[in-house]
Amino acid sequence: MSQDHESLENLLNEDRQFPPTAEFAAQANATAALYELAEKDRLAFWDLQAKALSWETPWTQTLQWEAPYAQWFVGGKINASFNALDRHVIEGRGDRVAFHFEGEPGDTRTITYAQLLVEVKKTANALIELGIQAKDRVAIYMPMIPEAAIAMLACARIGAAHSVVFGGFSADALLSRIQDADAKLVITADGGFRKGGAFALKPAVDEALKGQHNVKNVLVVQRTKQETAWNSATDIWWHEIVDRQSAEHTAQGFDSEHPLFILYTSGTTAKPKGIFHTTGGYLTQAAYTHRIVFDIKPETDVYWCTADVGWITGHSYIVYGPLMNGATQVMYEGTPDTPHKGRIFELIEKYGVTILYTAPTLIRTWMKWGDEFPNKFNLSSLRLLGSVGEPINPEAWMWYREVIGGNRCPIVDTWWQTETGGIMISPLPGVTATKPGSAVTAIPGISAVVVDDNANPVAKGHGGFLILDKPWPGMLRGVWGEDERYKETYWSRFKGIYFAGDGAKLDKDGAIWLLGRVDDVMNVSGHRISTTEVESALVSHESVAEAAVVGAQDAMTGQGIVAFVILRGGIAHASGEKLVTELRNHVAKEIGAIAKPRQILVVAELPKTRSGKIMRRLLKDVAENRQVGDATTLADPNVMKLISEGLNTSKDED
C-alpha cells in the first residue's frame, strides 16, 4: 500500500447519537472519573480493581513487562473458584440464585450460590479421586447445562487448566485439542437437547479417543438418558462418582500466573491456536469489566448472556465475571427457534431478565423473522442490552434498541477477543453517549489506538489498524506450546505492539468503529474498502435482513465486490433483478459508486460457524469459482452447495 494512501477508506457516515439518561447516569456503576483515574496512574488503577477480589497472598509487583510477555500481580496467590463461590457464601449471599437453568425440553433448575458451591466442591473431590492434580489439563465437551460451569469451576478450584471444546465440534477437532493440551481427563455428557430432539456427544468422544492421547478417564453427565456406548475401563458416570463425594473441600490459592484455561481459536493454518490465560489478571479484568460495562446490580438484576461456555464470551461473561460479582443469571440449553421463534423473549419475560448480552448474528436473525415474535412478550424488565462477537450494523443496532429495548435501554457494543480475555472497547452505560454501530472508546485502563502502516495514530475521520499498545491484565500469556507462533501472530506486524488483525476507523468525534478483520478488506481500483461498511449499507435497506460481502478477483478493478443477502421475512424472492439493481444503487447512495457490488445474490442462508460468525472465505471461494475449502465447522454444511449453484446462475452487473 502506498504511504500516501489511506490505510482504510472511511466511507459510511452515521450521525445518530444517544446520550445516557439522567436517571440511568444517577445509578450507574461507572463514572467519568474512572477514565481520569486510569489515565493518571494506570497500574494503580488496575491494583484497585484487583483488590476487589479475594487474594490468599497479596502481590508484590503490579506488572512485570518484557514485550511480549506480561506478568500481572506478581507473587499474589488467588483461587478462581473461591472468588466465584465461597466468598459469597461466607459473606451471607449463599441463598442468592446463581443460575436459573432452562433446558430446551422445558425442564428447569434453580441453583443458589450455596448449592453451586457444594456441587463444585464434590466435583473437585471427584477430580482428585481420578488423579487430576494442579497443572494437569482437562478437556470439557458439554452441552449448555449447569454441569459445564461446575466442571470448569472444579478444575479451577484444584488448579487444573480446563480446555473447553464447543459441543458442536467434530471428533477430529476434539482430538486435536485433546492432543495439543495433553489432557488427562475428558468431561462430557451422553448428549443434550437441541432443535426439539436429543443429540449425542459421547460418540464423538469415543471416536476422538481412537487417536493418540494420554486421556485416563471420561467423566459422563447423564443428560438425555439415551443409549450410550460404554468402556468400563475408562468411562465413569458423573452421578456415580460425584454424588458420593464429601461436600468439604478447602480451596487453596494458586500463583497469579498459574494457567487457568486454554481456549482454541481457529488459525489461518490447519492447526488451531491454544490461547492460554492465567489466573489473577484474567479474573481481575473479567470481574471489573462485567461490573462497569453491564452496570450489574447483583441484588436486583437478572443477567443473561446467550453465548455458549465453549467460547470466550461464555468463560468471561457466564462463568467467571458474573459469578465473581454475585450475579443471578439465566442459562438456556437450546436454540432460539425451539419450540418457537419467540423462545428467547419468552424466557426474558419468564425470568424478568434485566440485562441481555447477545450476538449481532442473532439480532439480525430476529429482524429477519419479524417484529411479531418479540412483540408477543413483555420485555419491559430489560434495562441494558449488549452486543458481542463482530461489528453490529447500524440498522441492526437501531432495531435492537427500538424493538427489544423499547427505546429506553442503553446498548453496549463490546469489542474484545479470545486473546484479550475481557472487554476492551465499549461505551460505559450512564457515562458514554452511544452511536449505532460503534464500540465508541477503550474502557478505563485499556489503551487502544487506530494507526497507519507505520504505527502512527490516524487523524479523526480516518481508518487503519487497531492496536493495543500497553499490556492489560486479561491478556493471553501465549499460544500453548508454540512460543514462536505467539510472537509471529500477534507481535510481528508492529514491533512490540499487539495487533490481532482488526481494522478500525475514527469518526469525526474520535469514536472507534470496528471494521472486521483486515483480511476482510477489499481492494477495488486502489480503494481499500471494508466488507463491514458495505454489509451495513446493504442491511440499511428495508428489504435486507442480513448481508455478507467478499472481494473477488476482477480483471478490471483488481477486486470486485460480491454480496450475498438474506431478505427480511415476508419479502418475495421474486423481486429478483429489480431488487438487485435497487440494492446496488442503494449501496452507491450510502457509500459511493466505488462500493457498488459487482454481483448480488439473494440466498436463504449464509455459511456460519457454530458460534454464528459468517465464513467469508468460503463465500470468496464460490465468488472466485474455486472448489469450496474446509467447511467442517459450518453449522449447516449444505448451505455452500446451494449458494454455489445460485451464484453460477446469477449474472454480473455492468
What role is predicted for each listed range?
Residues 153, 157-240, 352, 359-360:
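Structural core segment of the AMP-binding/adenylate-forming
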Residues 120-121, 243, 275-296:
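Conserved structural elements of the adenylate-forming
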Residues 165-191, 205, 349, 356, ...:
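AMP-binding/adenylate-forming catalytic core of the ANL superfamily
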Residues 95-97, 218-220, 231-264, 271, ...:
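Conserved pre-ATP/AMP-binding loop-to-beta segment of ANL
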Residues 441-445, 456-490, 529, 627-628:
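Conserved ATP/PPi-binding loop(s) of AMP-dependent carboxylate-activating enzymes
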